[in-house]
């Protein structure tokens, strides 16, 4: 593995992740999403501020960022699986702490899930289904994000141990880093969940 390729992939992935899709969509509608609700740029806050259509576009854009970063590292820069995993994690970090928004951003749920699918669909697709079910039943976007990130790390570990032929240990790096990023970004939400004051998503 050529480390200069990995470093370049990580740097580009961070910039890709930093593209503030929700913020740009909000601006297109005359709204500064940073001044609404949670102040985050993710789909949940866009949904609350602007409705379903803009939120759906935000979710799609955020998902594509992580997938594009991994595809760039894996198929164009040929970094190998570790480089792809690090690039995916860098995209999530860029999404959560965008250099273009003075290091503000989202919580990384959709980007993390999309990156998980891009790295290992055997893990990613079931985890997205589970996270979606958790969201549907609880209406807590934060819990769904934690399910996709921390649950994804747990699932990657189980798959690696049980079915090593369809897993790569390098993907655990992605799972670990993205879990840290999501948990850190969701600290206020976790506190509200523990206090029973977290807002549910009710607008569609």
Regions found by a protein language model. Name each.
Residues 125-127, 141-150, 166-178:
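Loop-to-transmembrane alpha-helix initiation sites
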Residues 48-74, 87:
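Multi-pass membrane catalytic core of lipid/isoprenoid biosynthesis enzymes
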Residues 22, 27, 92-104, 130-139, ...:
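C-terminal ends of transmembrane helices
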Residues 47-52, 73-76, 94, 108-138, ...:
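Interfacial segments of multi-pass membrane proteins
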Residues 2-28:
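N-terminal signal-anchor transmembrane alpha helix
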Residues 32-43, 100-113, 140-149:
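Short, non-helical or kinked segments that cap or interrupt transmembrane helices
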Residues 23-55, 104-106, 187, 191-204:
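Cytosolic, membrane-interface loops and tails of multi-pass inner-membrane proteins
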């Amino acid at each position: 593995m050529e480390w200069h390729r990995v470093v370049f992939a990580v740097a580009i992935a961070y910039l890709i992740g930093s593209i503030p899709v929700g913020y740009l969509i909000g601006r297109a509608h005359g709204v500064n999403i940073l001044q609404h609700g949670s102040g985050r740029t993710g789909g949940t806050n866009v949904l609350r501020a602007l409705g379903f259509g803009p939120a759906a576009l935000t979710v799609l854009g955020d998902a594509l960022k992580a997938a594009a970063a991994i595809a760039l590292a894996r198929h164009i820069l040929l970094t190998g699986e570790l480089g792809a995993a690090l690039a995916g994690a860098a995209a999530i970090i860029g999404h959560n702490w965008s250099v273009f928004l003075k290091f503000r951003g989202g919580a990384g749920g959709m980007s993390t899930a999309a990156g998980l699918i891009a790295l290992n669909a055997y893990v990613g697709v079931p985890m997205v289904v589970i996270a979606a079910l958790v969201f549907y039943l609880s209406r807590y976007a934060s819990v769904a994000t934690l399910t996709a990130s921390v649950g994804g790390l747990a699932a990657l570990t189980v798959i690696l141990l049980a079915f090593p032929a369809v897993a790569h240990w390098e993907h655990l790096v992605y799972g670990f880093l993205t879990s840290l990023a999501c948990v850190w970004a969701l600290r206020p939400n976790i506190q509200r969940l523990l206090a029973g004051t977290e807002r549910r998503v009710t607008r569609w």
